[in-house]
């Protein structure tokens, strides 16, 4: 009696699924992932509560004697974006709440992606991975997907923290003429916009290899070049058009920069 042994074909799909499982398992076992998510949850609570407590306080410049009155947030959603007011002015434009808001998470995800990828090269994991089974293109795809999921979780955590901070401070949840649909579209647009930023961070990280400081400096510097476009593309009054633009832009950046990252890995040393 003959026994036939069939070997499962190690296709692109199987290799990618295997790498994604390993990367997500490693991500959820990494301490700094939970630290970054915890920071994303706590930061909006601290900022909202502290700014609310300082509302109306007066500080005097000792040199000029000029008094400055601190203005706290008037609305919970100022941590998400700029709200329209009755007189047509923006609520939360260039003040503290306008600068220290949910858009900071686009820079926070850079920290995680850089540390995760540079650790692969520093520990020798990436070199062993490419030697045994994985292809460099699959590595780039896996790291991009992982970074996107991490970025989405950071945005959701910040959103939850914003609601908690507003509730603790007793701020208004009024959308000032906007709708819940606009708020949902705003969050979806921001999540999809992560597909623009994450490939940039992946590219810089694979180029920096084991040099975490270089990856962080390059990613934060490169991200800042596009950072100012975030509130314009994903305003609080976002519509399906904003979501579509972020989706198309994200796909173009993911494909284009992913191909460049793959090329960089093929043409450079792994150490």
Label the predicted regions.
Residues 15, 135-136:
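Short coil/turn motifs that cap or connect alpha-helices
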Residues 235-246, 267-271:
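Membrane-interfacial helix-loop-helix junctions in multi-pass membrane proteins
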Residues 7-9, 33, 37-116, 141-208, ...:
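Secretory targeting signals
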Residues 2-7, 23-27, 251-271:
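Junction motif at the cytosolic side of a transmembrane helix
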Residues 113-132:
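Transmembrane helix boundary and interhelical loop/hinge segments in multi-pass membrane proteins
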Residues 2-41:
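Aromatic- and glycine-rich beta-strand/loop motifs that create alpha-glucan
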Residues 42-48, 220-231:
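Aromatic-anchored segments of alpha-helical transmembrane domains
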């Amino acid at each position: 009696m003959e026994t036939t042994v069939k070997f499962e074909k190690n296709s692109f799909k199987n290799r990618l699924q295997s790498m994604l499982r390993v990367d997500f398992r490693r991500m959820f076992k990494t301490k700094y992932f939970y630290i970054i998510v915890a920071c994303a949850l706590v930061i909006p609570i601290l900022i909202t509560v502290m700014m609310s407590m300082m509302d109306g306080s007066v500080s005097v410049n000792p040199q000029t004697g000029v008094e400055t009155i601190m203005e706290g947030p008037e609305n919970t959603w100022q941590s998400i974006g700029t709200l329209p007011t009755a007189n047509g002015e923006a609520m939360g434009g260039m003040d503290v709440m306008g600068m220290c808001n949910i858009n900071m998470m686009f820079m926070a995800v850079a920290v995680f992606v850089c540390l995760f990828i540079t650790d692969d090269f520093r520990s020798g994991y990436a070199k062993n991975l490419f030697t045994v089974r994985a292809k460099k293109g699959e590595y780039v795809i896996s790291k991009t997907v992982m970074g996107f999921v991490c970025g989405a979780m950071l945005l959701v955590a910040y959103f939850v923290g914003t609601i908690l901070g507003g509730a603790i401070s007793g701020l208004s949840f009024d959308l000032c003429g906007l709708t819940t649909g606009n708020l949902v579209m705003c969050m979806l647009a921001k999540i999809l916009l992560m597909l623009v930023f994450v490939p940039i961070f992946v590219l810089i990280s694979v180029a920096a290899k084991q040099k975490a400081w270089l990856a962080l400096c390059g990613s934060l510097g490169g991200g800042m070049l596009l950072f100012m476009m975030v509130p314009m593309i994903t305003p609080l009054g976002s519509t399906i058009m904003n979501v579509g633009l972020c989706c198309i832009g994200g796909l173009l950046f993911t494909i284009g920069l992913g191909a460049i990252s793959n090329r960089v890995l093929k043409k450079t040393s792994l150490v």
